Amino acid sequence: MKQLSTMKNLLIAMLLWSVGACFVKPMPRQMAYDFSSIDREIQAWVDSGYYDGAGLVIARENQIILDTCYGNYTPETQVYIASAGKWLAAATIAAVVDEGNLSWDDPVNQWLPEFTDVKGTATLRQLLSHTSGYPDYQPEGAHRDDYQTLKESVLHIVNLPADTMPGAKFHNGGLAMQVAGRMAELAAGKDWESLFQEKIAQPLGMVDTHFTPVDSGGGHSPMLGGGARSTLYDYTAFLNMIFNKGTFEGKRILSEKATEEMQADQVKQAAVAKHEYVERVRAEMHNGIYGLGEWREELDFAGNAVLISSPGWAGAYPWIDKTTNTYGFFITHVNVEKANQAGFSSFYSSPVLPMLVREVYQTENKE
């Protein structure tokens, strides 16, 4: 049964504290928007059986303006979020870079000398922007990368042949991020889950968000690129921090420079194939489609990202829209069988949400 409410400011703050996620204190003024168009869209997905349930939070300028759940979902529902975890992974590594223990331009072989081929010359920023030249996943017939440690994962990546020279081509995948995570582990002297908890999860109150244990059932590996699981409020706290340029509840989590680097064009001159994600969901082609762990869906005239996201194949979709000063998180997990039968793509459907928010915002401002 659908649960729908646009919460008043005090109630929202109390609820978020109760589940362990803390937001910047909401602005005192009340904001009322008609989100019925979004409600109808998501409810139709659930009614069609594509999702058993879903949750959605939308915030504007640090104030929650929509908080709703559908089907059997509650704010505490924890699911694997697939590639939505890439944003979390990049932020964790950014925290290690902030400490000076690692550089975005460090080559792989500086930390992992066993990479003696061209893969060893790829830089940390190339690993996190899918321009390293690494294969996207393990080859057909090989063991899927559902290893429980990055050390073990890297052992099975080192001997794979490179697809291209570093910097030559954008190729979205997961293996390169495993190597990036291992570099961060070595630089910080800690395992990945401990790093994530210390640098990102605990400071943000993300008590139900983890990268381990890695799912061995299929569809949610490798660890950094697809293995995170989270909840509605946990991930929204992360978005609040990114929206506020690295600060959360008055605490500095990431440097402002780190958030800028993550959002900057990291594809540069690498070739981008036609019909890549951004072109498909926004019907426009530009080369600067990716930063570090996040998509740059829309750019302004100066080339700055104004709509950033990290969509997961199963439907989870976090975004920040600078044109409306809003951010949101849609959490769900697709029923693969029913979606495939209907030709429904969870990956390409969720990105309609920020567009619907814009329509609502523009309509309200005209009245």
Regions found by a protein language model. Give the residues of each.
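Active-site helix/loop module of the DD-peptidase/beta-lactamase fold
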Residues: 75, 80-84, 96-135, 139, ...
